A protein has these predicted regions:
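N-terminal Rossmann-like dinucleotide-binding module
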Residues: 1-54
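Glycine-/small-residue-rich active-site loops that bind phosphorylated ligands and cofactors
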Residues: 19-20, 83, 106, 132
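Short, well-ordered coil/turn segments that N-cap beta-strands
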Residues: 34, 73, 96, 123-125
Length: 145
């Protein structure tokens, strides 16, 4: 890339399930400013298949090993809910910005620790609440409130 064009964001995905496949990776594939560099899943065959399907150069079974070796700029945490805290904290400790699926954590205390870790690291920690602005959500909100 030229000096005037920034390098693409290097994104790693933790969790190779449906949300990672149909939402995160599908969206990243449409972006010229994003390069998917790694995927991790506790089931290695699922990680490999996901990587092949999306043209991702490496598949991993251990998040910390992946983060150390690949050094992504951003991590999408799409793992099962009970693993969000550990995966988010590992990504922040590795110096990555994080996009985490909902729910952010299993307890308010975990969510607060994640927020503080992001602040201390000077990294963005964002949560994916994309349905908040969907028409059906807005209509339901109006009916309830």
């Amino acid at each position: 890339m030229s000096a005037s064009t920034p390098s693409p964001l290097r994104v790693a995905i933790i969790g190779a399930g449906q949300v990672a496949d149909k939402v995160h990776a599908s969206y990243y594939a449409t972006r010229r400013d994003v390069q998917m560099v790694a995927v991790m899943d506790s089931h290695p065959e699922q990680a490999r298949a996901f990587a092949e399907r999306h043209g991702i150069p490496s598949a991993w079974q251990d998040a910390r090993e992946m983060l150390e070796a690949v050094k992504p700029d951003v991590v999408s945490v799409c793992s099962p809910n009970r693993f969000h805290f550990g995966h988010v904290m590992a990504a922040l400790e590795a110096g990555c910005h994080v996009m985490c699926e909902k729910p952010p954590a299993m307890t308010p205390q975990e969510a607060d620790r994640m927020r503080m870790a992001a602040r201390k690291a000077g990294k963005v920690l964002a949560y994916d609440f994309h349905h908040r602005f969907a028409l059906d959500t807005q209509l339901l909100r109006e009916a309830v409130i």
